[in-house]
């Protein structure tokens, strides 16, 4: 029986992509795991049917090289594309460095779009599935995450449009709205710009950047197992996974905006 194939971006050790790569591998897939530097995926190197590819989603030449490599492996098809690579940016909007902000959009929005466009012939040939790993922040809009949340909200709008545009070709599109997940990808020694108007709340902002403000997080392994289950069930549209993800859905769906504002401000620790 021919193995199904999946390409996953952002598979550095300790992150969601790595856990997804292992979960797909356990299901018998040929996994094409990517990261900017392959040395960050050495924990996956010795697994059978695990192909490691250096790939920066902001570099079109690297994406084209990955397409060519996978075409040679599969004969021109790809069953699943998982756009997981992403960068965070925790900063008050007034303090945002615009060059850095544009780079966040390059990785979180334009990167997935580049991947989808380049791999679309392979996905259409396989009647495959595109999975965009998103964040509940794109809907709950927490403080200090304005740039990051905006990039993920743009990705959600793109995904939902693509979901309908690709229906005639039998290609599914799934957005995974991710809650709190235990990973190793947090900032350390966070500091605001010295002239920031928000220095009085630097401690609270730093706690969020360093991942210490929320003790309860779903393990990346459990998260990945559930997400892979959603993907293999051919469930297009939107799914919510990770700690507090379902709660976030109901808050956005049912809570009046003024109450959401109160909760958001309280959770940020400001008055």
From Swiss-Prot:
A single Gene Ontology CC term: lipid droplet
Key words of the record: NADP, Oxidoreductase
Classification via InterPro entries: NAD(P)-bd_dom_sf (IPR036291), Sc_DH/Rdtase_CS (IPR020904), SDR_fam (IPR002347)
One of the protein's GO biological processes: phosphatidic acid biosynthetic process
Residues engaged in binding NADP(+): 8, 34, 40, 56, 84, 148, 152, 181, 183
Pfam family, one: adh_short
Pathway as given in its UniProt record: Secondary metabolite biosynthesis
Keyword field contains Oxidoreductase: yes
Keyword Cell inner membrane: no
Gene3D superfamilies per the UniProt record, alphabetical: NAD(P)-binding Rossmann-like Domain
CDD domains on file: 17beta-HSD-like_SDR_c
PROSITE patterns hit by this protein: ADH_SHORT
Molecular function via GO: acylglycerone-phosphate reductase (NADP+) activity; triacylglycerol lipase activity
Enzyme type, top EC level: oxidoreductase
Domain of life assignment: Eukaryota
Active-site residues, Swiss-Prot/TrEMBL: 148 (proton acceptor), 152 (lowers pka of active site tyr)
EC number(s) given by UniProt: 1.1.1.-
Family affiliation: Belongs to the short-chain dehydrogenases/reductases (SDR) family.
Function: Short-chain dehydrogenase; part of the gene cluster that mediates the biosynthesis of the indole diterpenes penitrems. The geranylgeranyl diphosphate (GGPP) synthase ptmG catalyzes the first step in penitrem biosynthesis via conversion of farnesyl pyrophosphate and isopentyl pyrophosphate into geranylgeranyl pyrophosphate (GGPP). Condensation of indole-3-glycerol phosphate with GGPP by the prenyl transferase ptmC then forms 3-geranylgeranylindole (3-GGI).
Protein name (record): Short-chain dehydrogenase ptmH
Source organism of this protein record: Penicillium ochrochloron
Classification lineage: Eukaryota, Fungi, Dikarya, Ascomycota, Pezizomycotina
């Amino acid at each position: 029986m021919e193995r199904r194939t999946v390409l996953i971006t952002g598979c550095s050790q300790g992150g969601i992509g790595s856990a997804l790569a292992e979960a797909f591998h356990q299901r018998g897939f040929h996994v094409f795991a990517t990261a900017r530097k392959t040395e960050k995926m050495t924990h996956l190197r010795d697994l059978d049917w695990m192909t490691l590819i250096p790939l920066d989603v902001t570099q079109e030449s690297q994406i084209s090289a990955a397409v060519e490599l996978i075409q040679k492996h599969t004969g021109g098809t790809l069953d699943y594309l998982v756009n997981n690579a992403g960068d965070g940016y925790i900063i008050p909007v007034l303090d945002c460095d615009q060059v850095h902000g544009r780079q966040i959009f390059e990785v979180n929005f334009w990167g997935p779009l580049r991947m989808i466009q380049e791999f679309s012939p392979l996905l259409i040939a396989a009647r495959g599935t595109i999975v965009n790993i998103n964040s509940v922040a794109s809907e709950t809009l927490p403080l200090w995450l304005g740039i990051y949340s905006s990039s993920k909200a743009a990705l959600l709008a793109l995904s939902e449009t693509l979901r309908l545009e690709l229906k005639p070709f039998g290609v599914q599109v799934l957005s995974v709205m991710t809650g709190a997940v235990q990973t190793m990808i947090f900032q350390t020694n966070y500091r605001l710009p010295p002239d920031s108007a928000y220095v009085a709340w630097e401690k609270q902002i730093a706690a969020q950047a360093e991942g210490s403000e929320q003790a309860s997080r779903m393990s990346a392994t459990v998260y990945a197992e559930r997400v892979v289950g959603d993907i293999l069930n051919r469930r297009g549209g939107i799914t919510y996974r990770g700690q507090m993800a379902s709660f976030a859905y109901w808050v956005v769906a049912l809570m009046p905006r003024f109450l959401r504002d109160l909760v958001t401000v309280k959770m940020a620790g400001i008055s």
